[in-house]
A protein has these predicted regions:
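Short glycine/proline-enriched coil/turn segments at helix->beta-strand junctions
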Residues: 17-20, 50, 79-83, 109, ...
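Glycine-rich Rossmann NAD(P)(H)-binding loop
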Residues: 31, 55-61, 86-94, 143
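Mid/C-terminal beta-alpha module of Rossmann-like enzyme folds, strongest
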Residues: 73, 80-126
Length: 160
């Protein structure tokens, strides 16, 4: 897969450089407000509002990254002069269906949410698709001087 390969190559170049470096990995970022480039949360919201949301996978896991927390993480990394490779997402693991279900409930959308299967989708597509992209954030949590918001808290802060 092109994206994954180029990302891995870029990380390798950075890690083999002779300067101090920091890499922050994230997964499925979202904001609590709208932005030009649609994010994970707003893609689901828009799909529900327009009655065009595809069935959501119950067998694919991801770890959403709340942008407000990521900004604080970046600030912490700079202040503490942290170097190395860190996972900087929420540390939570959600299926696409669970994520959409919580959005549906939180915003009282009453959308008829359908379950989908990544395994079934992959039978009809040549596109590579990781079954689990959630990240373990134990390493960075040791250095943070603040508590990350839970994804549920972050979604509740979202402005429609």
């Amino acid at each position: 897969e092109w994206y994954g390969k180029t990302k891995a190559l870029a990380e390798e170049v950075i890690q083999n450089s002779s300067i101090d470096w920091t890499i922050l990995r994230i997964d499925q970022p979202f904001r609590n407000d709208t932005f030009t480039k649609i994010d994970t949360l707003h893609r689901v919201l828009d799909g529900m509002k327009n009655n065009k949301l595809y069935p959501q996978f119950t067998d694919h896991h991801f770890g959403p990254t709340y942008i407000n927390d990521l900004a604080k993480i970046i600030d912490c990394v700079i202040r503490q002069k942290m170097t190395g490779l860190y996972h900087a997402s929420s540390g939570e693991s959600w299926t696409d269906f669970e994520f959409a279900q919580f959005i549906n409930q939180n915003f009282n959308l009453n959308f008829d949410l359908k379950e989908g299967s990544l395994a079934e989708y992959l039978k009809t597509s040549n596109r590579p698709y990781q079954k689990n992209t959630a990240l373990n954030i134990d390493k960075i949590k040791l250095a943070l001087d603040f508590e990350l918001k839970s994804i549920k808290e972050a979604i509740k802060e979202t402005i429609l």
